[in-house]
């Protein structure tokens, strides 16, 4: 089995990393009582989604911020807060929206098993401090590219 770094998969475009919409793009006033759920840091579990206190946005917001739509197999991390947690997006959450303080990892190559990656992120070999460093580097790289 080969050992591959996530950064190498990003560079070869086998995975895609995307930050959630910034506060200027998604305002608190856009949340509604009924609509499409928005996955925020508080909704991230350990490869699971916690639907308690989930917020929602309307169709116009979803259309405008379609680049932040989640798909089955995506892995969502928090950019701040509980960085040791993540959510593996199932068919149930397909079409939901990624929240502002989240980072989405999307597998673009069939040779990479997204579910395996999600399980790997749960193992003890991933130190939470390492995850903090990874998130800071990812955020820095994403901001520098713009």
Residue ranges and their predicted role:
Residues 1-22:
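Non-catalytic DNA-recognition/assembly elements of restriction-modification systems
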Residues 15-16, 44-47, 82, 104:
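Active-site/binding-pocket entry motifs
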Residues 19-27, 51-53, 132-134:
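Short coil/turn segments at secondary-structure boundaries
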Residues 31-33, 95-103, 112-115, 132-146:
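A short glycine-rich beta-alpha junction/loop motif
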Residues 36:
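Basic/aromatic-rich interaction segments and small domains that mediate binding to polyanionic partners
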Residues 40, 59-122:
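A short beta-sheet element
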Residues 43-56:
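Short, basic/aromatic beta-hairpin or loop at an interaction surface
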């Amino acid at each position: 089995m080969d050992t591959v770094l996530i950064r190498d998969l990003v560079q070869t475009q086998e995975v895609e990393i995307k930050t959630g919409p910034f506060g200027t793009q998604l305002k608190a006033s856009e949340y509604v009582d009924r609509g499409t759920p928005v996955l925020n840091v508080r909704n991230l579990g350990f490869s699971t989604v916690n639907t308690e206190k989930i917020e929602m946005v309307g169709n116009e917001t979803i259309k405008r911020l379609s680049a932040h739509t989640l798909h089955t197999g995506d892995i969502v991390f928090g950019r701040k807060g509980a960085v040791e947690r993540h959510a593996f997006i199932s068919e149930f959450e397909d079409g939901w929206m990624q929240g502002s303080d989240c980072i989405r990892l999307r597998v673009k190559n069939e040779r990479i098993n997204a579910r395996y990656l999600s399980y790997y992120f749960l193992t003890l070999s991933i130190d939470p401090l390492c995850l903090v460093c990874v998130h800071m580097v990812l955020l820095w790289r994403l901001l520098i590219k713009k």
